[in-house]
Every structure is written in C-alpha cells, then in structure tokens.
Amino acid sequence: MKGSRPEQSYLTRDNDPAATEATRGVIEDMVDGLNDHRIADIGEFFADGFRWMGNAGCGFKEGLREFQEAWQKPFQAAFSDKVCIDEARLFDGQWAAAFGRQEAVHSGPFFGIEPTGKKVVIRYMDFWKVVDGKIVDNWVMVDFPSVLQQLGHDVFDGKGWENLTDNPKRDFRPEQLPWRA
C-alpha cells in the first residue's frame, strides 16, 4: 500500500478487559431473549441510544423501537420456528462477537417473496459493544443472498464466485471441521 496507512482499530483502543465477564452475561442473556422471541421486554439489554447497523437489506436502526419495528418484528413475521445457533462467540472487554446461523421456516413475506414453507438457514455475524451493562452498538452482517437463493432467487444470476471452484454448490457446516471431532 502506497502512502499513509489508514488508522486501524480505533473503536477498540480504550477497551476495558475487566469488563469481559459482564459483557458475556449481557450478550448471553440477550441471545436467550431473542431465542425466546421476546419483544415487549427485550429492551432491558439495550441502551437508550442503541444503534443497530446492518448490511444492505437490513439497514441502520437507531433506538430500540426502530430496531423492533423495522427489524425484529418483520423478521419474526417472515420466519417462524426460528432458533439462533451461535457457532462461535468471542468476548474481550466491552466487545463481543458471534457468528452462526438461524434455522427457520419461511412463513411470511420476505423481500417481496410470499411464504414458501421452506426451511432455511440464515447465516450471520454480530459485533456488539456493551457499556454499563447495556448494548450500545450492534454491527450485523446477514447473508441475505444465501437466504434468497434457498428461496429460488439467485441475486448473482449464476455469476457468484462460488462458481469459480470445482464444487460450487457445497454446503459448509461448522460440524464438518476436522478438529471439531
């Protein structure tokens, strides 16, 4: 890279390692709440100025009400029998991260697609910052192209880079990792 390098990791510069266990407790309780499909009282985990920052299709939500009205409720309406399975969680001070999948049934409208009744796997990554026992920020990446593909809509029109390999349709599952046995 030529020229000056961009500043790296500035959001975690003042991280407090002593907060790790408190952060773990908040995130684990919040994930349990989401798995229990709590809406009315889920606010106990989020700060007043909570921000939820997602990729295209998810959007940016400011505050719990906007998160619930423009993410949590529509998501639950589109997908029933949903369970969240974090395949890995990492905790470091005020920060937590997870990746995993939600397994669900497409039972309501989703991006203009009427319910199909198909079981889908929704892969995601979450990064949270917890301050004073509340989630203040949540960065989210949801693999909507994969969900749409499972519902019969290839947003890449067959030109996705997975087609550059000898085995383009392989379905990776973490339980297939050789060191997991």
Identify the role of each PLM range.
Residues M1-A181:
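C-terminal and inter-domain tail/linker signature
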